[in-house]
């Protein structure tokens, strides 16, 4: 998931968005490099989204399905899931290679006017991110319901005279907070993109007109911004909730400050 998010930052933010607006690299604007970059950006975005779905399902099985957990939570299963997600993302994104004009790095007239492309864009929007949003909400709701039911049973079994906090209940509470945060973050950041993609086609993607500012275009760019932000926040949220990760981060910051003091003296 982290690797896919990093690829989104490199390909979508640095190689495309920043280049189109500020850098104007001729190499990235040539054909077929431009078309290939578009396919890679869409594929890595699909990977990022569906790895988030896979992580959500993995947490559901690990917490709620103890019998299935032994058979599912294996290295072989993880490898198969990664390969399927990567292959599926590439297959779904490849048709967009032919959406660009054959002479310059802009959308072709056929893409802008064809009903076939409009139907495929609708299909693309359903597969990513409408279906993932539904799956994430569903499995997180089932997981949270299981945790709440298990907490009620544990409280009933515990001796009423027992004092102090229950480490198991605290751990489950943190899991609920993590799942809720990931779900809310993903859904809220993707929602503007979903609204735009289900209603209008993408326009002025390569910023050929720097002064283009219709309300629909502003919604499109706002959706792009939040979509790209979503690709990195989920991994950060999950990482910061892990105790070992926080300890390593603190040690790294302490080392930098110590090194800075040594250099200064």
Describe the residue ranges of each PLM region.
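Loop architecture of class A 7-transmembrane GPCRs
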Residues: 22-46, 71-72, 76-79, 88-137, ...
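Hydrophobic alpha-helical transmembrane segments
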Residues: 52, 78-83, 122-123, 179
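Seventh transmembrane helix
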Residues: 133-139, 177, 183-198, 218-265
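Extracellular TM2-ECL1-early TM3 structural module of rhodopsin-like
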Residues: 1-57, 62-70
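Intracellular effector-coupling site of seven-transmembrane GPCRs
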Residues: 3-4, 81, 145-193
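Hydrophobic residues within alpha-helical transmembrane segments
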Residues: 3, 40, 84-87, 127, ...
